Amino acid sequence: VRLIPPQLADTARLKTLGDEQRKSASRSGAFHDFRFTDRLPESGITYRNRVVSDAAKNYKSAHYDHGTGMAVADVDGDGRLDVYFVSQVGGNALWRNVGGGRFEDITREAGVALSDRVGVTASFADTDNDGDPDLYVTTVRHGNVFYENDGRGRFRDITDASGLGYNGHSSGAVFFDFNRDGRLDLFLTNVGRYTTDTIAGEGYRFYVAFEDAFQGHLKPERSEQSRLYRNEGANRFVDVSAETGLQDLSWSGDASPIDANGDGWPDLYVLNMQGNDEYYENAGGARFVRRSREVFPRTSWGAMGIKVFDVDNDGRMDIFIVDMHSDMSHEVGPDREREKSHMTWSEEVRGDGKASIWGNSVFRNEGGGRFREVSDSINAEMYWPWGL
């Protein structure tokens, strides 16, 4: 049985919407000469994502419904990009690119299945400077895992020795060299405590979510600080969050480094899925100074994904952020969007409304550490995005 929402089955309405979108796109000045074709059947990839009961048959509004991530890197040095998929249930999967758009499952040989825990996402990074990508995997209260790559696509679990075995409600793993010592450090984003201590699962274990999980940001006791780990060399890391002043309590799913003020030191923009984003300025690799509202007076409320790139080709890095809360005032998609765009949020939930942008935000770098929010002028809004 396939259920198609009436508004999506209305071909006349879809044609009108398509015409409007093409008209808008023609004015954007952005053009391309490529197209995408679904090649999944030919690829040989049979991976299927499985989610815990709280996000499936026993669905409740909890952060489990945010799903999982993936990471891409050339794990065996053959010049082709391989793909690592993360699943909440049943284990993760590493698919080796054999060329010609074909892949083979090498999870067992690589030793990276992690079938005993609820996965969230993963990041590849050459943390020991040996020329091959190592792997860090985040989980929900089963302990994060760090693997060292032997250069041939075989991985060794070095979590305990590395100091990166954080156990909590982790999400994004952002590797960057914050102190410019030539070694990649790690900023680990933690969402906040959204699960109880009750364990459930049929053939697997997970922690049941709070019934009021999405009100967790109103309860200080559920905050979970994100962590900054300094790379000491030889894949050994030390938590320097307190030492550097980077003690962020946002309900964060991701973050991104950016040299926002042009001083040569990577600063950090931290997303908050249940509040306003935060910005920390790097003070010479020794400390981070919170300058969120001075540099970004208004940010998205409910940010889910971030990319730093040069939007307008002026040589300066800009910031594109997708937000799960739309600012659209007219119906543009499924009925849920119309309901969502007319929601009224209590002051208690949204905090300082004057500092909030409802919908995606694009910060154009004006130089000199100044940014201007231009999402409306470049048509950057879309229907309920969850990642970027």
Regions from the language model: what does each represent?
Residues 1-388:
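Acidic, glycine/proline-rich Ca2+-coordinating loop motifs
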